[in-house]
């Protein structure tokens, strides 16, 4: 059965940006309520929100014929860290959207849901797909709203990203041995567009990372015991992860 493209758990990929990790941004757990996994600027991210995404992650892994990692294992901890990161970043974006004068209307979300239903053959079929993936219509709508809002904010944050001809030339000189082996990038002239996009993506990520870090400091992020991504992820990320949905 086809999967409705919805939510990015491992990383939030927007406009060619790999969103900044929040894993070093937290502080102590003394101010987090018992029914929350973290707070962002005083707003709680609830255990229910976390469990909803964990349920989705487990359903996706199971649907692929893979056994979900055991609780406490390094791979399991990476899932927890990634989900908490996603929820924290979504809250940071939501709290910052007003600064940029951007918002996402219920109509925009409903229009996207309608487009998905049309693509997959109607509401009943979409609901069946969502159930298979451990999701609900409410989660689908929330994920659409989060993604649309993040795209709008990201567009503002990275608007000034730029790449110079000098940077392109320097990149070519550093990677010519590899690029020249492929027909479409065999010369600087042919590779220029590819190099420009690569460098532009890097420039966007740099701006996004700096902005996220600054907003984290301004808002303040606190994690409940056992949910601090920096403490959960003490080893390199495993190869297996929840597939980002585009």
Question: Model features per residue range: what roles?
Answer:
Residues 110, 114, 123-124, 142, ...:
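Alpha-helix boundary/capping detector
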Residues 2-10, 21-34, 39-40, 65, ...:
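FKBP-type peptidyl-prolyl cis-trans isomerases
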Residues 132-139, 156-188, 203-223:
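Acidic/polar surface patches and capping/hinge elements
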Residues 29-144:
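N-terminal targeting/tethering segments
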Residues 1-75, 190-246:
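Short, low-structural-confidence N-terminal segments
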